[in-house]
Design a protein with these regions (language model features):
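A short, N-terminal "cap"/entry segment at the start of jelly-roll beta-barrel domains
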Residues: 1-40, 55, 126-135
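Double-stranded beta-helix
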Residues: 3, 103-135
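Conserved short histidine dyad/triad with adjacent acidic residue
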Residues: 28-31, 44-60, 98
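Short histidine-centered beta-strand/loop micro-motifs
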Residues: 33-35, 54-60, 77, 85-86, ...
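Short, conserved beta-strand element in jelly-roll/cupin
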Residues: 47-49, 60-79, 117-120
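Histidine-centered metal-chelating micro-motifs
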Residues: 53-55, 74, 92-94, 98-104
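Short acidic-glycine-tyrosine-enriched beta hairpin
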Residues: 79-99
Length: 135
C-alpha cells in the first residue's frame, strides 16, 4: 500500500529561526518536510523581510532547487570566481548542484517567500564555496 501525506501550507507551523541558536540565518520558515514526514527530500518555505538573505554557500552532497513564491530576489550563483548575479521574481526556478555556490538576498518591498527543496535529505551543512577545489 502506498504511503502518502497531504498538508495545507497554513497547517504547517511557521518557525522563527532567530529563537534557535544553532540554526542560522535568522529567518522564518515552514518545515513542510517535517509536516509530511519526508525521508528522501527536504522541503521548506523560507520567508524574507527586505534586505534579509541566505549567504553564499554550497553543499557537499545536496542539490537544492528553489522557486520564488512572492517577491524579488538577487541571486549569487555559480562556482567561486565565476559567479553570476541575477534578479528573479515570482514564478522563477533555480537549482544549485553539490559544490555549487549559491545565495540570495531579498530586494523586494514587502515580505518575500521561496520554496526550497533539497535532496538527498542528509545532514549537509553549508560549505564555503571559495574553499572548494575545482576538478
Amino acid at each position: 500500500m502506498p504511503r502518502y501525506e497531504i498538508v495545507d501550507t497554513g497547517e504547517v507551523k511557521e518557525t522563527d529561526l532567530s529563537e534557535i541558536e544553532e540554526i542560522p540565518p535568522d529567518l522564518n520558515i515552514r518545515a513542510v518536510d517535517e509536516a509530511l514526514g519526508t525521508e528522501e527530500v527536504g522541503v521548506k518555505i523560507w520567508y524574507f523581510e527586505p534586505g534579509e538573505e541566505i549567504g553564499y554557500h554550497a553543499h557537499a552532497e545536496q542539490e537544492e532547487l528553489y522557486y520564488v513564491l512572492d517577491g524579488e530576489f538577487s541571486l549569487k550563483i555559480g562556482t567561486s570566481g565565476d559567479e553570476e548575479y541575477v534578479e528573479v521574481g515570482p514564478g522563477t526556478f533555480w537549482v544549485a548542484g553539490p559544490e555549487t555556490g549559491h545565495g540570495h538576498r531579498y530586494v523586494g518591498d514587502d515580505r518575500g517567500a521561496v520554496l526550497a527543496i533539497g535532496a538527498p535529505f542528509v545532514e549537509d551543512p553549508g560549505l564555503d564555496p571559495h574553499s572548494l577545489d575545482e576538478d
